[in-house]
Regions:
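Short, amphipathic alpha-helical "recognition" segments used to contact nucleic acids or chromatin
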Residues: 129-141
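RNase H-like nuclease fold core
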Residues: 2-13, 36, 75-76, 83-88, ...
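Residues in the recognition helix of alpha-helical DNA-binding motifs
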Residues: 66, 150, 168
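Inter-helix linker motif
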Residues: 271-288
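Short, charged amphipathic recognition helices of the HTH superfamily
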Residues: 141-151
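Metal-dependent DNA phosphodiester-chemistry modules and their immediately adjacent helices/loops
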Residues: 102, 286-323
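Key DNA-contact positions within bacterial/archaeal DNA-binding proteins
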Residues: 61, 145, 163
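Acidic/histidine-rich catalytic cores and adjacent linkers
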Residues: 2-42, 54, 60, 64-68, ...
């Protein structure tokens, strides 16, 4: 028989039937690598907009495979089977927060009346999938009214109106509020805790953010109140204690200078509370009493004091600045003297410069608040207090998902040694830097 040869480099184009068989083989390989639960989880969380069609194909593969496992191959005679194929019907699955149409297979019982439910189809219609995906999109900047516009295949799919999206967001965000309120902190030491408040439509949200021994930032809790008062702050801190927060070890509490926060921290931590007043807030408070022409000189003098490595030298610099302010405006001098020593706590502890910049201000928690404010900026009407807390928590948790370790985290052991000296009663040498 004569052999057939082809020229080097030439090829024969595969037929449509061969291409379909090849694609089916690849799809089958995907199915063998992942079990149904893993594939459903991948669809609900990891399919991006450009891969929606791929997600639908995998969904069809899941459904067809379940039918084949339960009914056997098409036209195969299986005496012991309990269900049989019953055609197809238009249905819906939720993939990455989108309601998408699909021609789903149907099966029915052979020994009794009624249609059998496909487990994979029920999982792909999970009610938990839509709220979580809606929550992620809303906190990224998609409003309830515009949500339909970003859903792929909306022209072919099922209706997604602002009411259903809003209900999904309420459900998902309420779940996140509960999870945050139930976080446990047993066995975790937070040597540094930031406490601050922010206004949301006439209500105040008090937030606590902790830094672990290895420099990781974690959101601790949120409490809502009419104002930033001591009762609300104390309630937040006592709630954290009830969830395992350790108050028996010295803790550096970074505050913005509000007397209510100061009083609550002292009440809960007692002698273990070491207060660091935010240097940025102190500077702004003093500037409010001065004409703008004096602001550059004030900034220069405060920077020189706050960047000093010796506590006594830094304190002397602030006292010199206070005397200079006395000649300009006595109220400005009084503002600087109020809590002046507490703005130098990190200097007194001998914290290295890189970590000191992180601990000297409330910038870490202010940054989280800025993300939350960006998320809530699209809200046109605040209906109730629960809505404020849900939106604020959603924004703060989005900020937490992007947290990185604080700058200077390698110096955290030095800070821990300095704080622990207070427990032993040895105190700190104001002129000594912790090694």
């Amino acid at each position: 028989m004569r052999k057939r040869y082809t020229r080097r480099g030439s090829y024969r184009k595969a037929s449509k039937k061969q291409r379909r068989a090849r694609q089916a083989g690849k799809a089958r390989q995907i199915q063998l690598l992942l079990d149904p639960d893993e594939m459903v989880a991948m669809l609900q969380d990891s399919v991006t907009d450009f891969a929606t069609e791929v997600g639908l194909k995998v969904a069809r593969l899941l459904l067809d495979d379940e039918v084949e496992q339960r009914c056997g191959s098409r036209y195969e005679r299986v005496a012991e089977r309990t269900v049989t194929r019953y055609g197809r019907q238009r249905g819906m699955v939720v993939i990455a927060g989108q309601k998408l149409p699909i021609e789903r297979p149907r099966v029915r019982y052979t020994q009794r009346c009624g249609e059998a439910e496909l487990e994979n189809y029920a999982r792909l219609q999970s009610p938990e999938a839509m709220p979580q995906a809606v929550l992620k999109r809303l906190v990224r900047g998609v409003s309830c009214r515009d949500y339909e516009g970003v859903v792929d295949l909306a022209r072919e799919g099922f209706g997604v109106n602002k009411s259903s999206v809003s209900r999904s967001f309420v459900k998902a965000s309420a779940k996140e509020v509960r999870q945050l309120a139930e976080r446990r902190f047993d066995g975790i030491r937070f040597p540094v805790i930031y406490i601050d408040g922010v206004q949301y439509a006439g209500e105040t949200m008090i937030c606590a953010l902790g830094i672990t021994e290895d420099g990781q930032k974690r959101l601790l809790g949120v409490r809502q109140g009419a104002t930033e008062n001591a009762a609300v702050c104390t309630a937040l801190l006592e709630d954290l204690c009830g969830r395992g927060l350790d108050t028996s070890s010295p803790t550096l509490l970074v505050l913005d200078g509000a007397k209510a926060l100061h009083a609550a921290a002292k009440r809960v931590w007692g002698r273990n509370a070491l207060i660091q007043r935010c240097q940025v807030h102190k500077k702004r408070n003093v500037q409010e009493h001065l004409p703008q022409k004096h602001w550059p000189e004030l900034s220069r003098q405060l920077a020189a004091a706050y960047h000093a490595t010796d506590y006594q030298e830094a304190l002397k610099g602030l006292k010199t600045t206070a005397r200079w302010l006395e000649r300009l405006n006595p109220d400005a001098a009084a503002s600087l003297r109020e809590g002046m020593e507490e703005t130098l706590t990190v200097v007194r502890l001998g914290v290295p410069e890189l970590l000191r910049r992180t601990l000297a201000t409330t910038n870490p928690i202010e940054s989280a608040f800025s993300v939350a404010e960006n998320v809530t900026s699209r809200v046109k009407r605040w209906r109730d207090g629960d809505m404020r807390k849900r939106w604020c928590t959603a924004g703060l948790l989005r900020a937490e998902s992007k947290f990185r370790r604080v700058k200077g985290y390698r110096h955290m052991p030095q800070l821990l040694r300095a704080l622990d000296r207070l427990v032993l009663g040895k105190g700190l040498d104001d002129n000594r830097k912790i090694a």
